[in-house]
Amino acid sequence: MARLSPLHLRVQCAIRQQQLLHPGQRLLVAFSGGQDSFCLLQILRDLQPRWGWQIFVLHCDHRWSADETECARFLQGWLQQQGLPHAVETADPIRRDEAGARAWRYQQLEKWARTWDCSAVVMGHTASDRAETFLWNLLRGTGAAGLSSLDWQRHLDDRDPTSAQVVRPLLGLYRWETEQFCQQHQLPVWPDRSNQDLAHGRNRLRLEVMPYLKQHFNPQLEAALNRAATLLQAEHELVVAQAAQLWPQVYEPALPGLRRDPLRAAPLALQRQVMFQFLSLVLPHHPTFEQVEAGIQLLKADRGSRSPDYPGGHWLEVKGDHLVCFH
């Protein structure tokens, strides 16, 4: 076996410490052809003899530009040359919408994870991505869940605990490190020209805002944001766990509603988490902060009080000791 570099050892250490992957697993690698995914794929291939993994690769072509289609053709040829089991999925023409594109990619990942019987979907997000995501979500307005959303692992489908695990072994590396690795190993990285388009807010944040903040406020900005995300993740997990313990005492599925007395006695952070979970069950979409707060206000309101209308014609109303959802 070839000797592992310090970078290989750091990733292998993260895999073990975070319990991301196990020997003999079938892995589906989400492969864009950029420097992070090339670095990820090469490290996994180098570690493969020690771990006994079976590696499969999926590339998704959104067809937003001729460059993307050319990239897909190039990567397919390279993957064939490398003898790697792979698939290239091509989207129907869709408008340039990041949320829609992400949903489509995850659908393809679910499909191919089932097809190849892969228990883990491996993604190349780095600490630089985590810092960028933290700041982006903070500027848009979000809670602890959004600020700590890019974690080491999660289920591919949040609603299905049997779905494959999404794992991110490179979260301990920064973007400059994956770039250096690709150069050292002469990997044929495909530059994504769309990443330079300042019409997209995320690109402007990465190319202009974060360098400005590094220069004028904190040269270690990415490390600072990663620390904040890590701390918030642990605190959010604690609140979610405590809310799960409180849930059977307050939730009345037959109504559907919540018992006000035990929920009113809980700390505000738990009230908000339980209210968020309840509204997520009864509304067509996850509730906003304002919608959660409207529900919280009713915990101390007089009988007969009701909330403003929620999406889908729902509202909450105080009925005795219960807060009931009507439709």
UniProtKB/Swiss-Prot annotation:
What InterPro entries does UniProt report for this protein, alphabetically?
Answer: Rossmann-like_a/b/a_fold, TilS/TtcA_N, tRNA_Ile_lys_synt, tRNA_Ile_lys_synt_N
Q: Keywords in UniProt for this one?
A: ATP-binding, Cytoplasm, Ligase, Nucleotide-binding, tRNA processing
Q: What organism is this sequence from?
A: Synechococcus sp. (strain JA-2-3B'a(2-13)) (Cyanobacteria bacterium Yellowstone B-Prime)
- Please name the top-level EC class of this enzyme: ligase
Q: Which GO molecular-function terms appear in the entry?
A: ATP binding; tRNA(Ile)-lysidine synthase activity
Q: What is its EC number?
A: 6.3.4.19
Quote the entry's note on domains: The N-terminal region contains the highly conserved SGGXDS motif, predicted to be a P-loop motif involved in ATP binding.
Q: What does this protein do?
A: Ligates lysine onto the cytidine present at position 34 of the AUA codon-specific tRNA(Ile) that contains the anticodon CAU, in an ATP-dependent manner. Cytidine is converted to lysidine, thus changing the amino acid specificity of the tRNA from methionine to isoleucine.
Name of the protein in question: tRNA(Ile)-lysidine synthase
- CC annotations in GO: cytoplasm
Q: Which Gene3D superfamilies match?
A: 1.20.59.20, HUPs
Could you tell me which cysteines form disulfide bridges? none
Family, as annotated: Belongs to the tRNA(Ile)-lysidine synthase family.
Which Gene Ontology BP annotations are present?
Answer: tRNA modification
